[in-house]
Amino acid sequence: MQNYQQPLRVGVGGPVGSGKTALLEALCKAMRDHYQIAVVTNDIYTKEDQRILTEAGALEPERIVGVETGGCPHTAIREDASMNLAAVEALAKKFGNLEVIFVESGGDNLSATFSPELADLTIYVIDVAEGEKIPRKGGPGITKSDFLVINKTDLAPYVGASLEVMERDTERMRPERPWTFSNLKKGEGLQAVIDFIVERGMLGVRG
């Protein structure tokens, strides 16, 4: 008989360098005093994101597990999510009372999606530095994720990106689906992500 609770599993995806790990660090630090949290990171050949989160003090080290996927990062979160499912189950059993487990995908493209067996909610992170055209390119990450984060808004003037254009295209590509602009260096947009997780994940507001 299962003697541990099933946590809410939140998948966090997005291209390399978009700010997935920075978002996870910020989420963990903001939520850890109110909820029981753990993280599973995915890297192809290393456990670099696990190391970054651990050294940043996002959570206690034993709450952060790194998975080396090898090969294509899409497969490890979609077609064959067995390594990630095993890591999630191991963490849930170890702590018994986990309420949220974040699963960070390896760097991927706009077509990557999480298996519904692995993630109850999905957050997709893109960044302004990739260009204002990214939202209108579509792909499941843009159109199907439960929540979209457009990060690094502070870079817009330097890359010639119009936030107004990005907002218009985002609203067109994912009507009725929530999203936010963010500048995680300053904490901008973070609360919108937390509110989404708490509300959609039915966690209950605390703190």
Curated annotation (Swiss-Prot):
The cellular component terms of Gene Ontology attached to this UniProt record, alphabetical and capped at eight, are: cytoplasm
* Location in the cell: Cytoplasm
Record GO terms (molecular function):
GTP binding; GTPase activity; nickel cation binding
Give the residues the record marks as binding GTP.
G14, P15, V16, G17, S18, G19, K20, T21
- A biological process from GO: urea catabolic process
Query: Do you know which InterPro entries this protein is assigned to?
Result: CobW/HypB/UreG_nucleotide-bd (IPR003495), P-loop_NTPase (IPR027417), UreG (IPR004400)
Q: Which UniProt keywords apply?
A: Chaperone, Cytoplasm, GTP-binding, Nickel insertion, Nucleotide-binding
- What function does the entry list? Facilitates the functional incorporation of the urease nickel metallocenter. This process requires GTP hydrolysis, probably effectuated by UreG.
Which protein family is it in?
Belongs to the SIMIBI class G3E GTPase family. UreG subfamily.
Description of how the protein assembles with itself and partners: Homodimer. UreD, UreF and UreG form a complex that acts as a GTP-hydrolysis-dependent molecular chaperone, activating the urease apoprotein by helping to assemble the nickel containing metallocenter of UreC. The UreE protein probably delivers the nickel.
Q: What is this protein called?
A: Urease accessory protein UreG
> What organism does this protein naturally occur in?
Pseudomonas entomophila (strain L48)
